[in-house]
């Protein structure tokens, strides 16, 4: 729905703000917040919005150049010398069968791979609950 991505990003930032005091020794605050802001940046190109109706649909043109919004965000961050943020974006879906470029089921991944996935998942799960409450 129109505004859903902004709401989701805002929720992710709020979760990060709440979690950071517990995690501050394990993760850089700027990197955490940047990853929360950028993890779905490719969605602004992956989907089209009809601003009159608010209807959102998949942009078929996106597939010509990109595999997914995660790939777009990963590439954007790698191009701008931000590999840690890129890796957080690559793993934010958690599992390869859910669209993650890096599967969190792999062994010996660094801690920061997991945090944006869990933040994103919380926002997505609670967002669905609240939207269903509106119906």
Model-found features: residue ranges?
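Regulatory/sensor and coupling segments of signal-transduction and defense proteins
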Residues: 14
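All-alpha helical catalytic cores of prenyl diphosphate-utilizing isoprenoid enzymes
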Residues: 1-11
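Divalent metal-dependent catalytic cores for phosphoryl transfer on phosphate-bearing substrates
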Residues: 7-8, 19-132
């Amino acid at each position: 729905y129109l505004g859903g991505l902004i709401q989701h990003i805002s929720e992710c930032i709020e979760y990060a703000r709440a979690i950071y005091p517990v995690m501050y020794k394990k993760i850089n605050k700027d990197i955490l917040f940047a990853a929360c802001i950028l993890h779905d940046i490719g969605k602004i190109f992956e989907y089209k919005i009809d601003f009159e109706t608010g209807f959102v649909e998949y942009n078929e043109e996106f597939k010509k150049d990109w595999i997914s919004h995660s790939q777009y965000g990963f590439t954007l961050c790698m191009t701008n010398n931000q590999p840690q943020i890129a890796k957080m974006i690559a793993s934010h879906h958690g599992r390869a069968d859910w669209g993650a470029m890096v599967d969190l089921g792999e062994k010996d991944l660094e801690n920061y791979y997991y945090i944006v996935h869990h933040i994103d998942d919380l926002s997505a799960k609670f967002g669905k609950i609240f939207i269903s409450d509106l119906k």
